[in-house]
UniProtKB/Swiss-Prot annotation:
This is UPF0246 protein NTHI1156. HAMAP family: UPF0246 (MF_00652). GO terms for biological process: response to hydroperoxide. Belongs to the UPF0246 family. One of its GO terms (cellular component) is cytosol. It comes from the Bacteria. InterPro entries: YaaA. The lineage of its organism: Bacteria, Pseudomonadati, Pseudomonadota, Gammaproteobacteria, Pasteurellales.
Length: 258
């Protein structure tokens, strides 16, 4: 069973990280091509392209300038411990055991606009380049065109290594679009998290993101190997609703205490 998640805009390159074996990201040749494109952008260009403040644009212009193809523990950190958004709050990588992280290395992948696909212990340098960014490049008008079939093929290889042909899609639509689902040989399960607010169950973005991370944590800590085991997920107060679920879309509901 393989789970895929989105990256996060919020990064942590300051706090201490446990001592794990680390690896070079697989697609640095591709990353380098994107960096070359990004280095031609002014702070004003970047601010407009990414809809970010001048301050953030300046920070990321500096990041692109400093980025190097050689990743080491001085300029990088393992992806699992670098991302700090809502999904990663739920995942809470810092509290995972060494055995958990080793399991995650085989069963979890992170999609990335710059790196394509990352394993948890792959090194990464600080960056901001969301998959939906309309960054014109030698291969087309955006990052979906740039990555083409590369990410899909890498995901398939990771699925093949599992031996059960199951993919758990915990990524956002923006990132999952980089995976060409119709080209995958896999049973794809999409968990959906609904919260009851004002008497109606619906997706609430903040809660849903955190729940995706909780599901990753559950999968990792319980060493899940069977689709049916996913239905037992109960972290954060969620419960599996069989009546609302289908064979490929697993619906989990929760009641928010006002």
């Amino acid at each position: 069973m393989l789970a895929i998640i989105s990256p996060a805009k919020t990064l942590d390159f300051e706090s201490a990280v446990k001592n794990f074996p680390v690896f070079q990201p697989h697609f640095t040749d591709y990353s380098e091509q994107l960096i070359e494109v990004c280095r031609k952008l002014s702070p004003q260009d970047l601010s407009s392209l990414m809809s970010i403040s001048d301050k953030l644009a300046g920070l990321n212009v500096a990041r692109f300038a400093e980025w190097t193809k050689i990743h080491n523990e001085d300029n990088s950190r393992p992806a699992l411990f670098a991302f700090k958004g809502d999904v990663y709050t739920g995942l809470d990588a810092d509290s995972l055991s060494e055995d958990d992280v080793i399991f995650a290395q085989s069963h979890l992948r992170m999609l990335s606009g710059l790196y394509g696909l990352l394993k948890p212990l792959d090194l990464m340098q600080p960056y901001r380049l969301e998959m939906g960014t309309k960054l014109a490049n030698p291969k087309g008008k955006d990052l979906y065109a740039f990555w083409g079939n590369v990410i899909t093929q890498a995901v398939q290889q990771a699925i093949d290594a599992q031996g059960d042909n199951v993919l758990v899609n915990l990524a956002s639509d923006e990132y999952y679009k980089s995976v060409k689902e119709n080209q995958l040989n896999a049973k794809i399960i999409k968990p959906v998290f609904l919260d009851n607010k004002n008497g109606k169950y619906k997706v609430i973005s903040f809660y849903a993101k955190k729940a995706r991370g909780l599901m990753c944590r559950y999968l990792i800590q319980n060493r899940l190997t069977d689709i049916e085991q996913l239905k037992e997920f109960d972290l954060g107060g969620y419960w599996f609703d069989s009546a609302s679920s289908t064979e490929t879309e697993f619906v989990f509901k929760r009641d928010i205490n006002e």
